Amino acid sequence: MTLTGKVKWFNSEKGFGFIEVEGGNDVFVHFSAITGDGFKSLDEGQEVSFEVEDGNRGPQAKNVVKL
């Protein structure tokens, strides 16, 4: 299932952050889950679509697409 949300914060030096989902819990996002070529980073407040999978520490985003 594909969800949409906004980037709550993303630390490009460490390569991870969180996506805010309206009416739901924040979802962890790692730079390796961002689709596209080049430097993979997200900006605070940026809208994205993504899928959720169970990671080692709970739900995490995969197939993240910048909208």
Curated annotation (Swiss-Prot):
Its main location: cytoplasm. Residues 5-64 form the CSD domain. One of its GO terms (cellular component) is cytoplasm. It comes from the Bacteria. Keywords: Activator, Cytoplasm, DNA-binding, Transcription, Transcription regulation. It is found in: Cytoplasm. The keyword DNA-binding applies. Pfam families: CSD. Can bind to ATTGG and CCAAT motifs (Y-box motifs) of single-stranded oligonucleotides. Homodimer. This is Cold shock-like protein CspE.
